[in-house]
Amino acid sequence: ANPVVTFTMADGKVMKAELYPEVAPNTVNNFISLVKKGFYDGLVFHRVIRGFMIQGGDPQGTGMGGPGYSIKGEFTYNGFSNDLKHTPGVLSMARAMDPNSAGSQFFIMHETSPHLDGQYAAFGKVTDGLDVVNKIAEVPTDYSDRPLEPQMIQNMTVDTFGVEYPEPETV
C-alpha cells in the first residue's frame, strides 16, 4: 500500500492524501521525512487562489521559507519522467525558478491546471476531504492571495504501512 498522509486542520476538518513513491520517489521521501518531524504542524496555507490551488508548507508563512535544503525536481521538464497530471486534489511541490529548488512548500490543486504538468513535481493526491480543499480555496484573501483568516494545519501524520522510507537526497 502507498503511504497515506492525514492533514488535521485547526478547525478539526481532515484531509487524507495518498503519496505515489513510484511517480516521484525522492519527493515522497522528503514529504514523509518532514511530516514525521512535525515540520508542517502549525503552518498555514499562505497562498490561496480559487480555481487554481492552495499552497502551504512554509515555516515563515511568507512564501520564502523552507527546510534549509532543496531537492531535485522530479518532473519531465527537469529530465525526470513524471506523468501525474495537475488535476483537482493532486499534491505537488512548489519551487522558485530553479527546477531543483523545492524544499518543504507544497500545493494542492483546486482546479485542473495543465500548464503545470511536467513543470512541477506532482507526487500524491487527496483521496478523502476534497471538500476541505474546496473550502480553503474559497476563503477571502488579500491582494497577495493570503487568506484573511489563517488556514492552519494543526498537525500532519503519515501511515507508511510498515514500509521504511529513507531520508531524501538533497542538492
Summary of predicted features, one role per range:
Residues 1-171:
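Cyclophilin-like peptidyl-prolyl cis-trans isomerases
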